[in-house]
């Protein structure tokens, strides 16, 4: 019952149980009031004015709502629920249109919020469909500014300011809440239809019915004013789930990009691109709205970030994704010998693949070796659901994982495997290297505390305020903010205290104390436990669990942390695997970062799950005075000359499968590898990596 140019408008006004005006819908409160009236444009006549209360699931009203609307929870308790009210709305509008001999209409609302931020999100959460008429509407503020260009900007308009501009009455006390608003909007429309303006309603706003998938090229230009980052998503959420979270807003085609971590798994974040900046600004108002039981954080992002995640250059991927409106399923764990026929046979006739073999995309390494991943296209949701039922069924001798995917995830996975260089290049070190002025804690004395569950926006000042009087007991440079692999706050921090007693007191006093809107857990720990957590282990009041990179035997007894030279810290942590040194050797070494070595009899992949930010102390932010002479001593300190460090390990990723010892030694020509050790190297081959073993120490390349 809609058209691009209708003879009738339905002026619509609504209110929720929470915020009013410019913040309507920003607090997720439910709709409690709808008021509407039909306006016949050719005859300039109006139909009956209707007002309906809506019974919300939560009848608690905000103070602002009670004050502005005059409504009570008792009155709303007798009203009909939203789905019944919307049915009545359709029936009453149809009856009013028959009086004027019309059969089509378009909604007209005061701004975008009622339609986009209230009606669409709420009906989506309550799992019922809106009528087609709610997918097209006129924004009275935009139409007014088009008719009267000298009026205030669209974002500053209200019903009252528009009425004042036209010299109309603005005494709201004369009418019930909602009735005055609709009558005034009708009067504004009639003024716009007068001979002086002769305004024509021809270009309505539209709401997309569903999210459209599609590829994104790295050569595209993406406006940074149209991109947001959503954080805190359930790991199993798909692009359709995210589109549903932003229901009512127009997402660009292929505009949902789920982010992956270094292991290729989703990290709970997504970048979303909208059709324009206005839609993006409305999306930012959904900060901390809920997806199920989880609240989702929404922040601004840039076009470069979106292209980095969603953009691709492969013609094969572009052709695969060229089939629009397909459901994408990712298969993981395929046998390396699996063929297209094997995959089609595994899926079976109950879930036919779009285009047969053309609907399959195998992920391969640059040299053509399969990775065990594949993407599959299905033409409808039913076929995709049938495929997902085969999750962890057996193909060959392996179980296969199946889960929903997106066009952006296809690009990310292909980019990750296809763009790996044969010999990764590390950043050129700065000469001379300036050692960092701090050392990460080691030792078994439990003089540290761990803060877990910090707000992502929390800074050093917030942590020091949180600790209160205990700030005076923090060691110099003893505040360590922990960052994740994307360089963002992880919600953790480590604090080095002056003694174990001080750490115990802080843990007892501050545990589950509130910081902003979150409670923070505080655990006492040692420097060794702190480093274990940084490597991926877990620490809570039940104890410490080892990181996945260490075996239980390696965890059975704490070792002295290995020390690598300060200049090595310029490289990415994944590129360095140091061995342990004797206490005598490390005592004279320059300041260093800390890792844990593998056992003498075994080699485990040593990686860092989190990275500590440069630590600070209360002295650096003005909480405590620095010790006398500390600044002068730091300024006059001489840097230790760089000396060869025995036992350092260097990791090389992406080696060609047929790389020999001669090629590796040639690559390191000039780095003074001891000639006596050449004969002691033994090459161990595996499909994904190469390891060189020396008789006296491990070397991982």
From Swiss-Prot:
Protein localization: Nucleus
- Name the cystine pairs: none
CDD domains recorded: RRM2_ESRP2, RRM3_ESRP1_ESRP2
Question: Does the keyword Transmembrane helix belong to this entry?
Answer: no
PROSITE patterns reported for this sequence: RRM
- BP term (GO), one: RNA splicing
Q: Which domain of life is it from?
A: Eukaryota
Record-annotated RRM domain positions: 226-303, 327-407, 448-523
GO molecular function per UniProt: mRNA binding
What is one GO cellular-component annotation here? Answer: nucleus
Q: Which UniProt keywords apply?
A: mRNA processing, mRNA splicing, Nucleus, Repeat, RNA-binding
Q: Which InterPro entries match?
A: ESRP (IPR050666), Nucleotide-bd_a/b_plait_sf (IPR012677), RBD_domain_sf (IPR035979), RNaseH-like_sf (IPR012337), RNaseH_sf (IPR036397), RRM_dom (IPR000504)
Report the function annotation for this chain. Answer: mRNA splicing factor that regulates the formation of epithelial cell-specific isoforms. Specifically regulates the expression of FGFR2-IIIb, an epithelial cell-specific isoform of FGFR2. Acts by directly binding specific sequences in mRNAs. Binds the GU-rich sequence motifs in the ISE/ISS-3, a cis-element regulatory region present in the mRNA of FGFR2.
Give the protein family: Belongs to the ESRP family.
This one is known as Epithelial splicing regulatory protein 2
Organism of provenance = Gallus gallus
């Amino acid at each position: 019952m809609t058209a691009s140019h209708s003879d009738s408008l339905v002026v619509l006004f609504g209110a929720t149980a929470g915020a009013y005006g410019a913040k309507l819908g920003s607090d997720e409160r439910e709709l409690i009031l709808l008021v509407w009236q039909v306006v016949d444009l050719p005859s300039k006549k109006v139909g009956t004015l209707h007002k309906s209360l809506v019974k919300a699931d939560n009848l608690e009203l905000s103070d602002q709502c009670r004050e502005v609307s005059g409504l009570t929870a008792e009155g709303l308790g007798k009203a009909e629920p939203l789905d019944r009210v919307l049915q009545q709305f359709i029936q009453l509008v149809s009856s009013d249109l028959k009086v004027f001999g019309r059969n089509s209409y378009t909604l007209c609302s005061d701004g975008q919020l009622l339609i986009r931020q209230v009606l669409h999100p709420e009906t989506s959460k309550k799992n019922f469909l809106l009528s087609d008429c709610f997918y097209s509407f006129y924004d009275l503020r935009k139409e007014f500014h088009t008719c009267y260009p000298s009026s205030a900007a669209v974002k500053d308009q209200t019903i009252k300011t528009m009425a004042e501009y036209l010299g109309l009455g603005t005494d709201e006390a004369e009418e019930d809440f909602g009735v005055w608003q609709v009558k005034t909007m009708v009067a504004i429309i009639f003024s716009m239809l007068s001979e002086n303006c002769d305004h024509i309603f021809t270009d309505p706003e539209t709401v997309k019915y569903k999210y459209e998938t599609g590829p994104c090229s790295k050569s595209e230009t993406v406006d940074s004013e149209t991109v947001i980052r959503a954080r805190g998503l359930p790991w199993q959420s798909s692009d359709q789930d995210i589109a549903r979270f932003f229901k009512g807003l127009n997402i660009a085609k292929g505009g949902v990009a789920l982010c992956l971590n270094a292991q290729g798994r989703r990290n709970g974040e997504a970048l979303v691109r909208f059709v324009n900046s206005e839609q993006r600004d409305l999306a930012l108002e959904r900060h901390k709205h809920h997806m199920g039981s989880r609240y989702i954080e929404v922040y601004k992002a840039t076009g470069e970030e979106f292209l980095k995640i969603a953009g691709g250059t492969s013609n094969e991927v572009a052709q695969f994704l060229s089939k629009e409106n397909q459901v994408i399923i990712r298969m993981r764990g395929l046998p390396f010998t699996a063929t297209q026929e094997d995959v089609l046979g595994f899926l079976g006739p109950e879930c036919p693949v779009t285009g047969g073999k053309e609907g399959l995309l195998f992920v391969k390494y640059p040299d053509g070796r399969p990775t065990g991943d594949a993407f599959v296209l299905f033409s409808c949701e039913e076929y995709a659901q049938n495929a997902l039922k085969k999750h962890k069924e057996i193909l060959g001798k392996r179980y296969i994982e199946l889960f929903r995917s997106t066009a952006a995830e296809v690009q990310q996975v292909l980019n990750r495997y296809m763009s790996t260089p044969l010999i990764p290049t590390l950043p050129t070190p700065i000469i001379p290297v300036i050692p960092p002025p701090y050392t990460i804690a080691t030792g078994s004395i439990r003089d540290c505390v761990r803060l877990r569950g910090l707000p992502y926006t929390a800074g050093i000042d917030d942590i020091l305020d949180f600790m209160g009087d205990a700030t005076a007991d923090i060691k110099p440079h003893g505040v360590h903010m922990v960052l994740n692999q994307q360089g963002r706050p992880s919600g953790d921090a480590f604090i080095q205290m002056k003694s174990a007693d001080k750490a115990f007191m802080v843990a007892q006093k501050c545990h589950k104390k509130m910081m902003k809107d979150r409670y923070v857990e505080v655990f006492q720990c040692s420097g060794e436990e702190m480093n274990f957590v940084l490597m991926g282990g877990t620490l809570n009041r039940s104890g410490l669990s080892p990181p996945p990179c260490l075996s239980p035997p390696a965890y059975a007894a704490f070792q002295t942390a290995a020390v690598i030279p300060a200049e090595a810290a310029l490289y990415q942590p994944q590129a360095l695997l140091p061995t342990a040194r004797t206490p005598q050797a490390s005592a004279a070494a320059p300041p260093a970062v800390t890792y844990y070595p593998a056992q003498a009899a075994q080699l485990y992949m040593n990686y860092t799950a989190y990275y500590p930010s440069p630590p600070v102390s209360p002295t650096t932010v003005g909480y405590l005075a620095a010790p006398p002479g500390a600044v002068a001593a730091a300024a006059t300190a001489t840097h230790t000359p760089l000396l060869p460090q025995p036992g350092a390990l260097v990791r090389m990723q992406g080696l060609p499968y047929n790389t020999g010892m001669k090629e590796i030694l040639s690559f390191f020509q000039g780095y003074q590898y001891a000639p006596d050790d050449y004969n002691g190297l033994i090459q161990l081959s595996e499909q994904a990596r190469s390891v060189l073993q020396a008789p006296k120490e491990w070397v991982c390349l």
